[in-house]
Amino acid sequence: MYFGVGQSALSAVFLLTAALAGSGCATARALTAPPPGPARLAVVTWNMNAGRGDLPGLVRDIEEGRLVGAPAGDVVLLLQEAVQEAASELHELAAVRGWSAFFAPVHHDGARRRGNAIVSSRPLHGARAILLPRERQPRNAVTGAIAIDDQELFVVSTHLENRVSWWKAGFASDDARGRQAEALLRELPTEMPGIVGGDFNTWLGPGESAWRLFQRRFDDTPTAETPTFSGGLVLDHVFVDLPEGWDATTRVIPDRYRSDHHPVLTLVYGSNASSRAATR
């Protein structure tokens, strides 16, 4: 996420507005303890702060089990603000592991061309970019499909508008992100399970239309309460719609790995894992 001046003041205003808007939030499930055994899939969404983040360090910690307790069966990284100038390093990181990578540039900030990327330990099929309605800057999502235990899942990395319209009907408005969320959802399969991660810039909290729209479509998503950015803001999310009998847990990684955002880690457990009681 990129900011101009006055970030602290803006954060305070947005947190107040979020508290007022929270009564309209979508229902998310509350989870108990995770099932025993290693996860079948580890999914991380992370805004790399215009390429400044230490991606090799993050991948190393995932592979060595420091973040997931034990090495996960497979890994999918959903990255935002990767930069075209370092795309070769991204592809090299994937190539030496036999992984797949897809990067689509979207915005040039005068120094670097930023974009979204997917890196997957599973073969990534049908990778493409999806252009979103433009507000202040160009925005897109990247998507593709992977297969886990003979089950196909779509995966998406996206980055929504980071500004709001002020004082519409007396409140800050999230119309721009709402329009982008609607456009992205129209492009995604409706009869196929999938995972969407990204920097949704949900400054106004759970009552934001983008948050509610994705929570409704991806109703296996664990509750998101831990801040991912300064000022106590929850901007980054992993939304999941899983096959019958699968389950997931989500947590925010304490280390930012030189970015200004915390990575968000979702562990997906296949149908052979013990299910957990959950309330919705």
Region annotations inferred by a language model:
Residues 78-161, 246-248, 252-256:
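Structured beta-strand-rich core segments of catalytic domains in phosphoester-bond hydrolases
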